[in-house]
Amino acid sequence: VEWVSANPTGDLHCGHARNAAWGDSICRLLEKSGYDVLREFYVNDAGNQIVMLGESLISRYFEFFGKEYPLPENGYHAQDVKDIAADIAREDGDKWLTADASERLHYFMKQGIDRELAKIDRDLKLFRVNITSWMHETFFYENNMKRINDCLKMMDEKGLLYEKDGALWFKSTDYGDDKDRVLRKSDGTLSYLTPDIANHVYKMERGYPIMVNLWGADHHSYVTRMQAALTALGYPKGTLTVELIQMVRMVEDGVEVKMSKRTGNAITLRELCEDVGVDAARWFFVSKDITTQMDFDIKQASTKDYDNPVYYAQYAHSRMCSILRNPEIPQFHREDNYGRLTNEKELQLLKMIGEFPSTVAKAAKTYKPNTIAEYILSLVKLYHSYYNVVRVNNPDDPELTNQRLGLVMALKTTLRNALDLLGVDAPQSM
């Protein structure tokens, strides 16, 4: 599964957060279903944006020492760029003021990538997202672009390429694309598609026959050309699934909030976690289908009442835990028959517990973690209504009490497992 894959040029923002939560939950669902999942972040570190990052850092580095160095027209102005430049200045001193320009740019580009990725990894871990593979685009340019050239050779041998106007083209229209695509431009540089094809071929070579990518909705046209390339190379249909994620609007009291009140910049993933909590952020991002634009209600996500669905779900779990640790209720002992559970709500709850495995299987197969969120809300709504009308502890009927304790234990386990699939904690008390 390849997801997030934000450019290493700044902090993760709320759009990345939706991608991160959704993709991580897909990984959890697939792992729960028995798949060996590679959690991959594709690092776009070979494009012009990295040169702009390096030049921007140099400009801020010079500024730190009271010197002038022009900030590129398309450079990066964010505070984190200033912070990284200041860190380099404090660590290295002023030696880069008079260094060879090429060596200096290479150094600042590498420092920028490494430090930005370290922050991205830190923030993803805060968000309970664990990346196990960081695949750099520059990897495919190593050893005189061996992997890219091998890929182009394979395509050429299959008759998939032709030259026109000094450029190398892929016959992608033969495989469902609306026009043929340039792989190598007339000036000799590669298009973004070329190393990306090599990247996907390399995934297959590493033993991952199923690939799931999560991309922003603005990459819609890119899906067809990538699938065309894999089909042309002989990989089975369905090898690559691309989930397109629509945009997020942060709203408060019905009004869109575009900037952080603290920094005046776009709201970052870290700020969101600090403001509403990881549990609420994860829940809200995975509870709405990614095929539609979502409004993230900051105030609703921050409340500690039943209007907040994640609070509603977590409170059900804490209620279950409270019953099970109540010293006035006899300790549960396992039974072979639970025939005393005849209350209508008890039968409905038992049915829902039984449906959990198939719900997980469906969510994993369709890559739809919101299916689990919907299941959780149905389960806890039924449980809260049961809790309000049925006494678990009946001193005059220890057999019924014990069977109801068994039901509560099964509900607790099911709810905890369901919440974990979404990366949401299941607190024992609230």
Predicted regions mapped to residue ranges:
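Non-catalytic interaction-recognition regions
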Residues: 1-430
